[in-house]
């Protein structure tokens, strides 16, 4: 399995023509439709060589997109990476905070920290292992989550 960090920065959802909120079933339908359309064996014999190569490349991209988005674990990793990339593009990190400095909310099993705006930064126990940036639920501030080694 390929680590998400090593994956090229492609929008696998747009390759499948899908919305990031699409469920696995919808993604599978889009994949199946596209894979049939671009499959090398389904191409007409009178198509120019350059067009055939483009179709093969598209076929490979569609297959890669499905390998990532069709698996719950790799999809989750990819979605988290997309979220972090989006946050990095929003603005600079306001503070660096160690997970151990955050408070624990037993009710929803998450760590949280109050923001200076009155909102809060929160991250679930599972996500805390994987994310490094957390946005405030009220304002645009972002913190970087650190872990003691």
UniProtKB/Swiss-Prot annotation:
Q: Name one GO molecular function term.
A: ferrous iron binding
Q: Where is the protein localized?
A: Cytoplasm, Cytoskeleton
Gene3D superfamilies found in the cross-reference section? DnaJ domain (1.10.287.110), DPH Zinc finger (3.10.660.10)
Q: Which GO terms describe its biological process?
A: chaperone-mediated protein folding; positive regulation of ATP-dependent activity; protein histidyl modification to diphthamide
The alphabetized UniProt keywords are: Cytoplasm, Cytoskeleton, Electron transport, Iron, Metal-binding, Transport, Zinc
List the Pfam families hit by this protein, alphabetically: DnaJ, Zn_ribbon_CSL
* Subcellular location, principal: cytoplasm
Top-rank taxon of the source lineage equals Eukaryota
Please name the pathway.
Protein modification; peptidyl-diphthamide biosynthesis
Cite the InterPro entries for this sequence. DnaJ_domain (IPR001623), DPH_MB_dom (IPR007872), DPH_MB_sf (IPR036671), J_dom_sf (IPR036869)
Q: Where is the J domain?
A: 11-82
Indicate the family of this protein: Belongs to the DPH4 family.
Q: Which comment does the entry carry about domains?
A: The DPH-type metal-binding (MB) domain can bind either zinc or iron ions.
- Entry function: Stimulates the ATPase activity of several Hsp70-type chaperones. This ability is enhanced by iron-binding. The iron-bound form is redox-active and can function as electron carrier. Plays a role in the diphthamide biosynthesis, a post-translational modification of histidine which occurs in translation elongation factor 2 (EEF2) which can be ADP-ribosylated by diphtheria toxin and by Pseudomonas exotoxin A (Eta).
- Descriptive protein name: DnaJ homolog subfamily C member 24
| Organism name | Homo sapiens
């Amino acid at each position: 399995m390929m680590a998400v960090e090593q994956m090229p920065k492609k929008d696998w959802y747009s390759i499948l023509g899908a919305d990031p909120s699409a469920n696995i079933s919808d993604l599978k339908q889009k994949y199946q439709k596209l894979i049939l359309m671009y499959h090398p064996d389904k191409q007409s014999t009178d198509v120019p060589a350059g067009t055939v190569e483009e179709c093969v490349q598209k076929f490979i991209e569609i297959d890669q997109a499905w390998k990532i988005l069709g698996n719950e674990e790799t999809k989750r990793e990819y979605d988290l990476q997309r979220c972090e990339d989006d946050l990095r593009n929003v603005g600079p990190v306001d503070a660096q905070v160690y997970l151990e400095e955050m408070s624990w909310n037993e009710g929803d099993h998450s760590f949280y920290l109050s923001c200076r705006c009155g909102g809060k930064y929160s991250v679930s126990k599972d996500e805390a292992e994987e994310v490094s940036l957390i946005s405030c639920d009220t304002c645009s501030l972002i913190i970087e989550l650190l872990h003691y080694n």
